[in-house]
Swiss-Prot record:
Primary location: membrane
Taxonomic classification: Bacteria, Pseudomonadati, Pseudomonadota, Alphaproteobacteria, Rickettsiales
Keyword presence, Phosphoprotein: no
Protein's name in the database: Uncharacterized protein RC0131
Disulfide bonds: none
One Gene Ontology cellular component: plasma membrane
Subcellular location: Cell membrane
Sorted UniProt keywords: Cell membrane, Membrane, Transmembrane, Transmembrane helix
TM region(s), chain numbering: 5-22, 26-45, 52-74
Protein backbone atom coordinates (compact mmCIF):
# COMPACT_ATOMS: atom_id res chain seq x y z
CA UNK A 1 0.00 0.00 0.00
CA UNK A 2 2.70 2.47 0.99
CA UNK A 3 4.73 1.66 -2.12
CA UNK A 4 1.76 2.55 -4.32
CA UNK A 5 1.04 5.73 -2.37
CA UNK A 6 4.71 6.70 -2.64
CA UNK A 7 4.53 6.30 -6.44
CA UNK A 8 1.46 8.53 -6.55
CA UNK A 9 3.13 11.18 -4.37
CA UNK A 10 6.18 11.14 -6.66
CA UNK A 11 3.88 11.47 -9.69
CA UNK A 12 2.11 14.45 -8.11
CA UNK A 13 5.50 16.02 -7.34
CA UNK A 14 6.52 15.67 -10.98
CA UNK A 15 3.22 17.26 -12.03
CA UNK A 16 3.84 20.14 -9.61
CA UNK A 17 7.27 20.72 -11.16
CA UNK A 18 5.76 20.72 -14.66
CA UNK A 19 3.19 23.29 -13.52
CA UNK A 20 6.00 25.39 -12.02
CA UNK A 21 8.03 25.27 -15.24
CA UNK A 22 5.01 26.40 -17.25
CA UNK A 23 4.49 29.18 -14.66
CA UNK A 24 0.92 28.12 -13.99
CA UNK A 25 -0.55 26.84 -10.77
CA UNK A 26 -3.10 24.29 -9.72
CA UNK A 27 -6.68 25.44 -10.03
CA UNK A 28 -9.42 24.36 -7.65
CA UNK A 29 -10.66 21.83 -10.20
CA UNK A 30 -7.19 20.25 -10.44
CA UNK A 31 -6.96 19.94 -6.66
CA UNK A 32 -10.43 18.38 -6.46
CA UNK A 33 -9.49 15.82 -9.13
CA UNK A 34 -6.27 14.96 -7.29
CA UNK A 35 -8.12 14.53 -3.98
CA UNK A 36 -10.73 12.29 -5.63
CA UNK A 37 -8.04 10.11 -7.22
CA UNK A 38 -6.11 9.84 -3.94
CA UNK A 39 -9.34 8.97 -2.09
CA UNK A 40 -10.13 6.18 -4.54
CA UNK A 41 -6.59 4.81 -4.30
CA UNK A 42 -6.71 4.89 -0.49
CA UNK A 43 -10.07 3.09 -0.53
CA UNK A 44 -8.70 0.37 -2.80
CA UNK A 45 -5.61 -0.34 -0.70
CA UNK A 46 -7.05 0.15 2.79
CA UNK A 47 -8.37 -2.43 5.27
CA UNK A 48 -12.12 -2.68 5.92
CA UNK A 49 -12.25 -0.75 9.23
CA UNK A 50 -10.21 2.09 7.81
CA UNK A 51 -12.40 2.13 4.68
CA UNK A 52 -15.48 3.07 6.72
CA UNK A 53 -13.61 5.99 8.30
CA UNK A 54 -12.34 7.18 4.91
CA UNK A 55 -15.81 6.99 3.31
CA UNK A 56 -17.33 8.95 6.20
CA UNK A 57 -14.60 11.57 6.04
CA UNK A 58 -14.97 11.94 2.26
CA UNK A 59 -18.74 12.35 2.57
CA UNK A 60 -18.35 14.95 5.31
CA UNK A 61 -15.75 16.92 3.37
CA UNK A 62 -17.80 16.83 0.17
CA UNK A 63 -20.89 18.07 2.04
CA UNK A 64 -18.83 20.87 3.58
CA UNK A 65 -17.36 21.80 0.19
CA UNK A 66 -20.72 21.93 -1.59
CA UNK A 67 -22.21 23.93 1.28
CA UNK A 68 -19.36 26.42 1.04
CA UNK A 69 -19.52 26.60 -2.76
CA UNK A 70 -23.28 26.75 -3.36
CA UNK A 71 -25.29 27.46 -0.21
CA UNK A 72 -23.15 30.10 1.52
CA UNK A 73 -23.16 32.47 -1.52
CA UNK A 74 -26.97 32.36 -1.54
CA UNK A 75 -27.09 33.55 2.08
CA UNK A 76 -24.45 36.20 1.42
CA UNK A 77 -26.45 37.54 -1.53
CA UNK A 78 -29.58 37.60 0.64
CA UNK A 79 -27.75 39.64 3.27
CA UNK A 80 -26.59 42.18 0.68
CA UNK A 81 -30.15 42.76 -0.47
CA UNK A 82 -31.45 43.55 -3.96
Amino acid sequence: MFKNLLCIIIFLGINLNVYAINSSSYTTDDIIKIVIILGIVILIFSPAKFRIIVIGTMLGLSCAYFTYKYIVPIFISLLNGP
